[in-house]
Structure formats: C-alpha cells, structure tokens
Design a protein with these regions (language model features):
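Conserved beta-strand in the GNAT
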Residues: 48, 54-63, 78, 83, ...
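Hydrophobic, small-residue-rich alpha-helical packing segments that form membrane-like cores
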Residues: 5-12, 20, 47-49, 92-94
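Conserved GNAT acetyl-CoA-binding A-motif
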Residues: 98, 103-117, 264-275
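Conserved acetyl-CoA-binding loop-helix of GNAT-fold acetyltransferases
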Residues: 79-103, 249-261
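Aromatic-anchored glycine-rich loop motif in surface-exposed flexible loops
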Residues: 139-147
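Conserved active-site alpha-helix within GNAT-family acetyltransferase domains
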Residues: 107-111, 116-137, 255, 276-292
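Active-site rim helix/loop that mediates acceptor-substrate recognition in acyltransferases
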Residues: 23-68, 182-210, 308
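Intrinsically disordered, low-complexity, positively biased terminal segments
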Residues: 2-14, 69, 149-409
Length: 409
C-alpha cells in the first residue's frame, strides 16, 4: 500500500469533512453546520492521508491560547477532527499523523498540544495525559431547595434570543478565561457554535433559550438551556437541559441556578460539564441530589518540555531535577532542572542527578494542577529517585482552581 500524508487542499475540504463524519458513523453535515465547521477549520493546519484519490485519514489543528496556572494565553495546538477509515486501520496512519503534527507544532513554537478524546486510551502512547476532569450534574430540583445568597434579589434576569445575546455572553466568557486553567480563548467565529440549535440535535428538548443576569445594567452571567418535556402518570417531570452557564460572581451564579430550579413543569436540571470544584453542590442542602459524575475532558501534551514548564507559575517554590521519558518526541528526553515560584519559572537541561522520573504523559496530566504528582506516583507512574523530592514538587504543581474545559473542539 502506497499512501501520501499531506495538507488538505481547498477543493478537497468537503470530501475530507465527509470522510471524517463517515469514520464516526455520522451523516454528512447539512449546509448550515458545514459552513460553521468550515469557518472554524484552519485549512492550512488540516492534514490527511490519501490512498490514490481516496482520503482515508484526517487530522486538524487549531491555534488556541490556553490558560495555565499563573498565565493566560499560552500558545497551544488543539488537535481535532482525527479519523482513520476502517479499511485502513492498524497500518500506522494515525501514528504518522500524530508524529507529523507534533513536529509541526514544535516548528511553530507551540509548547503545548491539547485534545479531547472519543477513545482516551488511544492517545497516551503519543504522550497526551488526562489533565482536567468534567463534572456532569443531574440535579433533583423536586427535592432540593433553590440556592439562596444575600443580594440575589438585586440581580435582574431577562430571557433573550440566544443569537442576539451572543456579544454580551462572550464578554462574560472572555472575562472568565484568564482565571481558570484549562480554559481557551475562543477563536473568531466559535461563538456561533454555541447557539447552533438544529432540531435533530435537541434529543426531544424544545428550542434553545437564553437567560441573562444583569446587575446595574451590566450583563454578569447567562445560561443557555432548553426544556425537555416529560409526562408521567403523576404529572409533569420535565428536564431543564443546560448547555452553558457562566457567571462573574457567586451571587449571579446562585441567581441563575434559582431561576433554573424554578422552571415550571420540570423536576430536574442536567448540565453536561462543570469544573470539579463547582459551587453548586455547596450551595444546596444535600449534594447527593446533584447527581455528580466525573470523566476526563482535556488531554495535555508538552511539545517542548522546557518551554512548557517555564510557561506557567508554581504554587510554592520548586527546585527539582526531572528525568523525562518521551520516545515519541526524543528531543524532550533527558534531565531537566525546573526552578520556579508564583512569580515565574525556568526549565533547562542539566547533568545533575535526577530526583523524579516520569514520562511526558505524566507531565501533561500534572501540568494544569488537575492531577497531583503524588497521586500519579501512587499509581506507579512517577518515581521518586531522591527521598523527599516528591511532596514539595507535587505541591508546587497545584492550582487554586481546578482545571476545566468548558467546551469541546
């Protein structure tokens, strides 16, 4: 078999996009969704593998700016739209695309690569580590009292058209991005994705709605939601399906939840993604009624170990020598001395004795502060070579806020 790995040409994009959908068992996108995907695609960063005239594998990358502990706007390549046709599985095409991408990211000076995974077990062998968790909520509003905080009555709530409120909602989101690791500065045009509302995507729910929360005339929070009607013998038991919820302060956040709790003909609220340190379980009397479930969301891979570790700050002072294994990107292998604190950091090559040993995958998992080095060591994935080196390094990698990816890509 002779195949060619290369960049996608403009005239090939529609076929490339259709092959992506086919690999995921989906129908080709209708025109409106296709236009949104095309606008979000960086064609110059989209690659594929061709067997003759047939596109048999796809992969793309997006030029993100990622918030990391102590810093916002760190360049990160967002790996996306990865597929291999079933006729060409287990022939090394995915490995070739991953290697090609990482070399390209390095050449572009992007110290990090990030992705979300439909099958997480695939990407560990390429150095991607689970770095953030999602908390999914199914809140039993029939048995829970709504949150109450002083000042909530000063918050004005208005139902508005989701598209008309886009600019106000995006300003709220943009103000939150620098504060939490894992959040991405949205690329131009991505706000349109947030309000797509095709009937075949609603899963039985009604139209997408938006409530904005104002204080003194300023929009300080919003929720996008739909109501899924459910009728049982005993009466209505609908579900409020929340797509997005952001707020700039605790009072506005509680006011939005009080609104969602009180929607008529419903008995629960479902929300697919919140950070694991979300306030809602602490705002209600019985957190068991919040139906919390966890799953990994964002995967991180240091492309250049030195640049990546120097791009963030550290919760406590750190001075440690790391022995890094990275057979997929051998330029990262070897010993690195990491020194840093809350004001900045450096990470340089060294010949000093290593104190901790780990792979680049573990560095990715620890990078945003979502998984402690001590926890990774307990799983046998980090080795303490100098007694006493692990605990202070683990504390230094921590984050005041849990990392969170609010949306996929």
């Amino acid at each position: 078999m002779t195949t060619e790995l290369r960049a996608v040409r403009d005239a090939e994009w529609d076929d490339w996009s259709d092959k992506l959908d086919l690999a995921f068992g989906e129908l080709p996108l209708p025109p409106e969704k296709r236009a949104v995907r095309r606008a979000a695609t960086e064609i110059e960063r989209s690659i594929g593998v061709w067997d003759g005239d047939d596109c048999v594998a796809t992969a793309g990358a997006l030029s993100f700016r990622l918030t990391v502990p102590g810093a916002a706007g760190v360049p990160a390549a967002g790996v996306t739209m990865v597929s291999v046709q079933p006729t060409h599985r287990r022939r090394g095409l995915l490995r070739s695309m991953m290697r090609h991408q990482l070399a390209d990211f390095r050449e572009r000076g992007e110290p990090l690569a990030v992705l979300t995974a439909s099958e997480p077990a695939i990407y560990g062998r390429f150095g991607y580590g689970a770095a953030a968790l999602d908390m999914q909520l199914t809140v039993d509003t029939a048995r829970l009292a709504a949150p109450e905080l002083p000042g909530m009555d000063d918050v004005r709530l208005r139902l508005v058209d989701p598209a008309a409120a886009l600019a106000d909602c995006e300003r709220v989101y943009a103000r939150l991005v620098p504060s939490r690791p894992g959040m991405l500065a949205r690329l131009p045009g991505w706000e349109r994705i947030a309000v797509q509302d095709a009937p075949d995507d609603r899963d039985g729910a009604g139209v997408l709605q938006c409530v904005v929360a104002e204080v003194d005339g300023e929009v300080r929070g919003y929720a996008r939601f739909a109501v899924k009607p459910v009728w049982e013998r005993g009466g209505p038991s609908g579900v409020v399906v929340v797509r997005h919820l952001d707020a700039l302060d605790p009072v506005v956040y509680a006011a939005l939840w009080r609104f969602l709790f009180g929607i008529d003909l419903t008995s629960s609220v479902s929300l697919r993604t919140r950070p694991v340190d979300d306030a809602l379980p602490l705002l209600v009397a019985d957190m068991r009624r919040c139906g919390m479930e966890l799953r990994e969301s964002l995967f991180v891979r240091p492309v250049e170990v030195g640049a990546a570790l120097a791009a963030r700050t550290y919760r406590t002072p750190v001075d440690v020598v790391l022995e890094v294994a990275d057979p997929f990107c051998p330029w990262n292998e070897g010993r690195w001395r990491l020194t840093g604190d809350a004001s900045g950091a450096s990470c340089v090559r060294t010949r000093d004795e290593a104190e901790l040993a780990l792979s680049v995958r573990e560095l990715g998992s620890a990078y945003l502060g979502g998984f402690a080095l001590t926890a990774l060591a307990a799983a046998g994935r980090v080795q303490e070579l100098r007694p006493g080196a692990l605990a202070p390094a683990s504390r230094a990698f921590g984050s005041d806020l849990a990392p969170w990816l609010p949306h996929g890509f």
